[in-house]
Amino acid sequence: MKLTILGCFSATPRKDANPTAQVLEINNHLFLIDCGEGTQVELRRNKIKFARIRHIFISHLHGDHFFGLVGLISTFRLLTRETELHIHCPKGLKEVITLQMKLADSWTNYPLYFHELTSSDSELIFEDGKVEVWTIPLDHRVYTNGFLFKEKEGERHLHMPSVIEANIDMAYYNKLKQGCDVLNKDGVLIDHLKVTLPPNPPKSYAFCSDTAYKEDIVPIIKNVDVLYHESTFLEKNANLAPKTKHSTAKEAALIAKMANVKTLILGHFSTRYDNLNEFKREAETIFKPVELASDGKFFDFD
């Protein structure tokens, strides 16, 4: 599981930073999460192949989280993309993007699907044989979801000395890895648990931005490997958080602690702050380990 931060600051422009966007690579999927201005430039800068992006997840309809989307959709057209693109987003985004394309008389030459979200409950919005994606209902000034990405349990591993000793034909190796008992060459039924090892623990990642402090999300993100939680403010400006529906670094750490996550990443920093290490120090009074997002930063959680 790998995470690339393309942008991690809040809405106000800053010459050395971009608004929210990140790419999660999990089990051969490349998921784009939010798409603020400058996203496609950062994709190029970080050498991420556009064609591998087939699913985009938009948390909410504030511009710093989706103003880069129509440009990216247009670039896909210029690159003669043929692969379908799925956008998981709040209701209303399809109307916005369609109007922009209509006024420009610039339509896609590839299948474009909008999966618009309206539920206030956590729901499964994507699933295949390897990965699930769930919404995380957040508390912001407009309808907002975070996203929980979860690997499904993978195949078991062969313990080759035991497999050879059990006299099992190679043709049955895949069945063993899938958790099936098989007949050996002598016609004896072999328990797969005796010749295989458990699969690698499935990885999980939760993206929570933008949101006020909300303990209701704790059961949804319980025990995740990595939590990205917005921390727009430091505690010295905590009075600004409730009225803007954002969180402080301390509040993000409290959520991480209650949810028993393994690693907390802080992001969505207000541009009023120059020293981001203050966010880390504040959060570490509650929870460790804490990482700070920064544009172009790469996390490898394998």
Residue map of PLM features:
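Active-site metal-binding motif and surrounding structural segment of the metallo-beta-lactamase
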Residues: 38-88, 116-118
